[in-house]
């Protein structure tokens, strides 16, 4: 019998629980606020986690933002219901908590601030005065946890309908449909729901007009083809000029983070595919890497290269759709049909390897579902010989077109400061001249072993620059795939680890303890050690991350999913004010988003 597993149980785990006291920022905080001003939490997140007092939040945030090498981006902000958490040794007493994840580009380091809250006092000052992109994150945290952010400019629901009762991510809120009463939609309730969707400008701080004229308010979406999904944006117009606008999201919200609390660590993998439904295996990568940190698993070299290969195939697939639909939004129809021919070749290859097309659910904790099939290298070779010429034809026929350039150059332009303020990542950030791609800056899954370049813009991110960067990213992904083809390691496709992989059959037939453990792992799911882990990756649309909290159970205590599209849609008003409606259509096409990635 061929052994397709490697025994890693006796090796030193790659991820140790660390407090990161050696990180320079801890010393800087202690020098400024005193050695006893906060509690440092040891985790497997890979970043310092610091509990601070609520009264210090704004002062600490301002201090970090003004350091010589500042923490310039609020990467994520959300909450947690701590009431049922049993493993909290050494942490401040808390019924709920709010965390703030900050990034320093200059240091290439992060810090996570946490604030403990009592159930009878769920108040914390708004962070919007320091980071404008805290707006949506605070609205979502209030919506799903009921935590109030004092001073927030418009604290209202964002994911759930305005008529919703309760806060779904609380532990006392039902997680299964069978725990609810049967759904009924009466005429009165339908009228109430429709009334709640009526846009009232005063609720958003907008005026209906000036002394001399009235503004027009236009609904774009939630079913407009240029909205790229179930997404509404309300425009305040002075003629064709956009005075202001309000993006309205949540129509595609499926409770993905709540589902993480009721699925085993293994059975949640198919849900990750559907967060950004064009990304396929790219979505699975941060989740399985975060779980592997919790378990202390190091995967074989072959697994790393296979994962990179599948991720880059899906990156090309997503970028082709993005580029062709952008061209279509500007007014040219033909390229989108050419792109679907190319994408079909990728799907044929993906299906041959994984058995599925869009949502493979193929990565596994500790490896992949099965080894590469015979002939995979021939299919990949054929695609690599085909694609470069096609890419050149897209660029020559459409992207160098004078009309397309005129419609997109200088439109929805912003610089590095604005990109960082709004949490922009991916091509939108790199177009401003900031060279930050997680595959290079913080390599994962063996990306450090590949030779490829990161395309960077000249200082201003506009619609055309963002698209052309993705064209170059396609070429770099082809370089990576060429190296995967020529340097695929031999060896197993999964780690022999008791938390993830069933044992060989002969072992279960000889050792009763092995059989019992196998039975429990399959029926209940693996029990991950109580800890916290975090993993970010360079996804197709920007940085995607999973922040997992284990309470020593078969299921995640808290699954936080940070997606790039959410931040990018929040930036729309700041980037498009003063432009025309036709410019907005081009801008929406240049963002590269799908609403499942926004709403989760």
From Swiss-Prot:
Its main location: membrane. It is found in: Cell inner membrane. PROSITE patterns: COMPLEX1_30K (PS00542), COMPLEX1_49K (PS00535). The gene is nuoC. This is NADH-quinone oxidoreductase subunit C/D. Transmembrane segments: none annotated. It catalyses: a quinone + NADH + 5 H(+)(in) = a quinol + NAD(+) + 4 H(+)(out). GO terms for molecular function: NAD binding; NADH dehydrogenase (ubiquinone) activity; NADH:ubiquinone reductase (non-electrogenic) activity; quinone binding.
